[in-house]
Amino acid sequence: MNMEKRRIDAISNLGLAHIGDGVFELLCRGYLCEHGFKTVLDLHKKTVAMVNAPAQAEFVDKLLPLLNEEELSYYRRGKNAHVHAVPKGATPAQYAKATGLEALFGALY
């Protein structure tokens, strides 16, 4: 086990998701800027459409077959984290998948 792995393992599941939330949003914002969205309103609307639990859950379904075992373990850590509230507009299953995705991005960051 290298130092980086130990550092990641020391972060809580929801801590990884917290980091990954920021990473995922930054990646989405960069993608939108690179693909021709110019106005602040367009950038904001498209970002909000991408960075929410239902959209992230849909993205996870496409991403899962591409993950290796270590990446899947980070995803599962987040997906199985105990959250006490689910945002309106998302089902508990969607929110769990989104939290798993964010934990994965937090670990890979």
List PLM regions with ranges.
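Double-stranded RNA-binding/processing signature
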Residues: M1-Y109
